[in-house]
Amino acid sequence: MIKYVLLFISITMFSQGYETQKYEVVKKLNEIEVRFYPPVMKAKVSAGGNFSRLFKYISGNNEQGEKISMTTPVQMTNQDNINTMEFVLPSKYSEDNFAVPKDRNITVYNSDPGHFAAITYGGYSNTEKVKKYHSLLLKKLRESKLEVVNSKPVVLSYNSPYKVFNRRNEVLVEVKY
């Protein structure tokens, strides 16, 4: 029993040590934040086995054979029935300095800056929760008279699947600010 408790504690501690994508909160509206996200290097894939492909990339399946530190959040979108997953690369990487993926389905790019409205929720994320919080976010934005640039939800997950308590997930939409 003690070894299971120690395993749980180590997994929980390990999952909290990742570099997290930077953003600036520019406005708070009750449970909603309007944030500015500066450009950041990301790796994305829209092919089957998204997480596995990206995890292999950061585990050394790249031209340099370089192991890349995991970061948070993991970003997921569904545009036109195409699921895309993105990992934020550590801040030391730039357009001139990044590990080139061997998997040609993975694209590494510098994201555009932008303003996004975010709503946070706990527990494990699923389709029903995403729909619920996406609807709530859009409702609150209409009430606040904030213009939505792209209403498609961006789902952010900050925790390892092994973390059971105090999980953090978010739904974002791009807004004009």
Task: Report the location of each language-model feature.
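A solvent-exposed interaction/effector surface
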Residues: I2, T12-Y177
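Sec-dependent signal peptide recognition
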Residues: M1-L7
